[in-house]
Amino acid sequence: MAQSKFLREYKLVVVGGGGVGKSCLTIQLIQSHFVDEYDPTIEDSYRKQCVIDDEVALLDVLDTAGQEEYSAMREQYMRTGEGFLLVYSITSRQSFEEITTFQQQILRVKDKDYFPMVVVGNKCDLEGEREVTRQEGEALARSFNCKFIETSAKSRINVDKAFYDIVREIRRYNREMQGYSTGSGGSNAGGPSNKMEVNDSDAEAGCCSKCVLM
């Protein structure tokens, strides 16, 4: 199929507690390798050009600090982000419980009832150390009206799909917001009424998608 010549940039933000694998997911997406040891992130930005569902996309991915001492920086990147990956580790219940705080803060900063997000349960390769069931992750995402996916940065399981899904959700959200603003004339605060399907099959991981490093 013909691809659009317009290069649309998507500002994606990866949030979550410390040590959940945010940097590993981002680097695996951008550079296709797993980083086992690294210093805790303060804030790193990466760019990569992709074709997702026959549309060109430039992903501008912000990898954020999970440590509480950097929490004052959160509102700044939450204001500019177009879509958020809410990452926890399936081996850490504490990191799972922190996800709600991130979600609520994003909605407060955006002054919205809904905004494009994907809940990501990382480290699914460590099944023997699992503290959070898949069903719990799905239930949390359902309560947020967003999609859920389990990933492994180490084994590169569903890494691309997690980022592609948030781009797809941004596109859908923007289309609905355009229709919403030109429709009944109601407030935009609520956002689209038809949220992303939570239970889509992970088998769609690479459909019509490819990336090129910028």
UniProtKB/Swiss-Prot annotation:
Annotated motif Effector region, positions: 38-46
Lipid moiety-binding residues (S-farnesyl cysteine): C211
Binding site for GTP: 19-24, 35-41, 65-66, 122-125, 152-154
GO CC terms: plasma membrane
Residues cleaved off as propeptide: 212-214
Gene Ontology biological process: signal transduction
Modified residues (Cysteine methyl ester): C211
Residue span of region Disordered: 178-197
Residues in the signal sequence: none
Ways its activity is controlled: Alternates between an inactive form bound to GDP and an active form bound to GTP. Activated by a guanine nucleotide-exchange factor (GEF) and inactivated by a GTPase-activating protein (GAP).
Annotated InterPro entries: P-loop_NTPase, Small_GTP-bd, Small_GTPase, Small_GTPase_Ras-type
Membrane topology of this protein: Lipid-anchor
Keywords: Cell membrane, GTP-binding, Lipoprotein, Membrane, Methylation, Nucleotide-binding, Prenylation
GO molecular function: GTP binding; GTPase activity
Intracellular or extracellular location(s): Cell membrane
Function field: Modulates the activity of the adenylate cyclase catalytic subunit and therefore affects the biosynthesis of cyclic-AMP. Plays a role in both surface attachment and surface recognition of appressoria, a highly specialized infection structure for plant penetration. Regulates appressorium formation by coordinated regulation of cAMP signaling and Pmk1 MAPK pathways.
Assembly and oligomerization: Interacts with farnesyltransferase beta subunit RAM1.
Family from the record: Belongs to the small GTPase superfamily. Ras family.
Matches recorded under PANTHER family: RAS, DI-RAS, AND RHEB FAMILY MEMBERS OF SMALL GTPASE SUPERFAMILY
Protein name: Ras-like protein 2
Organism encoding this protein: Pyricularia oryzae (strain 70-15 / ATCC MYA-4617 / FGSC 8958)
Designated gene of the protein: RAS2
